[in-house]
């Protein structure tokens, strides 16, 4: 006697709809996870990730101005420079690096009228409680306090809120007429940041900053962060380096010179102490200048010797000592950066 197989029960419409909905949810979750990972530009939860050192593609935008190797410069962040009606500046240099927030547009206009170019400094990788946009940062954006800098904290570089803040800062630079920007503290991965930032996070962040800056026709620099140079060199137009002689790392930054891009190099021979009056008047000794101006790997750098306060005092490698007047009634929050 044969037995007929039991026929399979046909799927009800309800079961089909439930299964289809489940599949759709899984696909959506995967898509959101992938998209979020791409947007954040890297993981924030592994300090030991190896940086992606494959050079990023060069931007297609051609800029009106980029600095040249050997360009002379002055950096004044303690207060805005006081620009008089004289036909030149003190010192008579090509570029001034000034604080974005503290420097009025009128000062930048005056520098332009004297034939100078202006690079505007801001901290891209930290929260500073005294800045006018400090209220825009969210608690989740913030990490540990920078060692030695009360009121300043590392930030999560992949945060969309943080990136929006930096976009507005770059737009402020354009509105003020800055020719370039000097975004600082992009090397949080080298410090105890409390956010598990990696080199890949910094690389992705620099790519984002470039995508905002270049369409606004401004050049952009890399501040320190020597270990990511090979990846981001195509994105940036210059380096601003602090203390590569002191830390024996100038050879890393020589890659900029090899690529035809300048290195604006700062050394602080007196450390964080006050300069003696004789040094302020006459400059450092010849031996000190030789040490900080002719170090291994620094050939072609545009070197200045400065106080840690980054006020108007500067000495050049030829022994010239110059003092830029400052507007002490304006600003006063800019300060030097070298977090170790």
Regions found by a protein language model. Give the residues of each.
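Extracellular Ser/Thr-rich, low-complexity/disordered mucin-like segments
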Residues: 6-9, 42-50
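Alpha-helical transmembrane segments in eukaryotic/viral proteins
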Residues: 16-47
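Glycan-processing catalytic domains of CAZymes
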Residues: 14-16, 47-340
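Intrinsically disordered, low-complexity terminal tails of fungal membrane proteins
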Residues: 1-16
């Amino acid at each position: 006697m044969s037995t007929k197989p039991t026929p399979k029960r046909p799927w009800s419409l309800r079961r089909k709809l439930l299964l289809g909905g489940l599949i759709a949810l899984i696909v959506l979750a995967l898509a959101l996870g992938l998209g979020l990972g791409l947007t954040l530009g890297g993981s924030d939860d592994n300090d030991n990730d190896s940086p992606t050192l494959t050079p990023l593609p060069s931007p297609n935008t051609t800029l009106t101005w980029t600095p040249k190797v050997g360009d002379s410069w002055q950096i004044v962040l303690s207060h805005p420079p006081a620009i008089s009606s004289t036909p030149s500046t003190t010192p008579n240099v090509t570029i001034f690096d000034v604080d974005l927030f503290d420097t009025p547009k009128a000062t930048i206009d005056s520098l332009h009228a004297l034939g100078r170019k202006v690079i505007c400094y801001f901290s891209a990788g930290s929260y500073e409680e005294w800045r006018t946009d400090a209220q825009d940062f969210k608690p989740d954006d913030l990490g540990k306090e920078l060692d030695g800098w009360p009121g300043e904290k590392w930030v999560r570089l992949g945060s969309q809120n943080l990136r929006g803040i930096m976009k507005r800062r770059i737009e402020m630079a354009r509105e003020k007429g800055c020719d370039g920007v000097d975004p600082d503290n992009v090397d949080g991965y080298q410090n105890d940041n409390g956010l598990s930032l990696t080199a890949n996070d910094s690389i992705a962040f620099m790519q984002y900053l470039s995508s905002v800056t270049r369409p606004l026709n401004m050049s952009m620099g890399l501040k320190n962060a020597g270990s990511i140079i090979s990846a981001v060199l195509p994105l940036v137009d210059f380096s601003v380096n602090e203390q590569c002689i002191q830390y024996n790392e100038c050879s890393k930054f020589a890659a900029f010179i090899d690529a035809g891009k300048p290195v604006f190099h700062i050394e602080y021979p007196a450390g964080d102490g006050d300069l003696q009056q004789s040094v302020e008047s006459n400059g450092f000794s010849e031996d000190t200048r030789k040490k900080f101006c002719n170090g291994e790997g620094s050939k072609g750098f545009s070197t200045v010797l400065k106080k840690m306060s980054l006020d108007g005092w500067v000495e050049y490698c030829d022994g010239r000592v110059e003092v830029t007047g400052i507007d002490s009634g304006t600003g006063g929050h800019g300060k030097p950066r070298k977090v170790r």
